[in-house]
A protein has these predicted regions:
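Bacterial N-terminal signal peptides that target proteins for export
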Residues: 1-8
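C-terminal motif of bacterial Sec signal peptides marking the signal peptidase cleavage site
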Residues: 16-17
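Short, low-complexity, disordered segments immediately C-terminal to signal peptides
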Residues: 22-32
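Secretory pathway targeting signatures of secreted, lumenal, and periplasmic proteins
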Residues: 31-96
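Surface-exposed amphipathic alpha-helical segments
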Residues: 41-44, 159-194
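Beta-strand elements of well-folded, non-transmembrane domains
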Residues: 76-78, 129-131, 167-169
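Signature of long, low-cysteine stretches enriched in small and polar/charged residues
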Residues: 91-152
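A short, solvent-exposed beta-edge/loop patch
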Residues: 149-157, 164
Length: 194
């Protein structure tokens, strides 16, 4: 009886070791950086573009007109001598890129953020896109929330990554887990050899 019990324990251990383990998501390699696609219960993310300089993924939202997107772009940065200079540069650049004729800007917040001991900048932009509803001519506000992480490469501070996660939605369809989902995506960022 003891040998059957021992055999049963060995068999359980072997079967447990052979059980399928969750796979790590595929790393997307970019020039000096890598990221992972989101792991989700539903495989709704679409890889729209992938080059060594740009990766774009997106998925439809739960409601009509709602979408989520993540764009990682390798960028050139000016010579910046401090984390505060990076924050100031990012805020200035983002404000210039937001067209006031197209967007009503509610918030632009930029703060320093450490990623793998590298000084980065983290921003949150909340804006309303001014557009006319189909057929009515009445203006409709479509909200655009964007969380962006900008990091210089540790080996070449003039080379950076701009990783932006955005949610486009009607005002009543805000996603309460937006910031958490963005953080999950941004935590996949790694610096790679140049």
């Amino acid at each position: 009886m003891k040998s059957h019990s021992t055999l049963a324990w060995i068999l359980c251990a072997l079967l447990g070791a052979c059980a399928s383990q969750p796979k790590e998501p595929t790393r997307i390699m970019m020039q000096g950086f890598s990221i992972s696609l989101p792991r989700e219960k539903e495989p709704t993310w679409i890889l729209a573009k992938q080059t060594p300089m740009v990766t774009i993924i997106g998925k439809p939202g739960r409601f009509s007109g709602e979408s989520f997107a993540m764009q990682a772009t390798v960028i050139k940065l000016p010579a910046l001598d401090s984390p505060a200079a990076l924050v100031k540069h990012v805020e200035s650049t983002q404000r210039k890129e937001l067209d006031p004729k197209r967007y009503r800007i509610f918030k632009v917040d930029v703060a320093p953020q450490k990623v793998h001991e590298q000084n980065c900048a983290f921003s949150r932009v909340e804006a309303a896109e001014k557009m006319a509803a189909d057929g009515t001519g009445s203006p409709v506000n479509v909200m655009l929330e964007t969380l962006t992480l900008i990091c210089p490469h540790p080996k070449d501070p003039l080379l950076g990554i701009n990783m932006a996660y955005s949610h486009r939605h009607f005002p009543e369809d805000a996603d309460p887990s937006f910031a958490e989902d963005a953080a999950t995506l941004m935590q996949t960022l790694d610096f790679e050899p140049l």
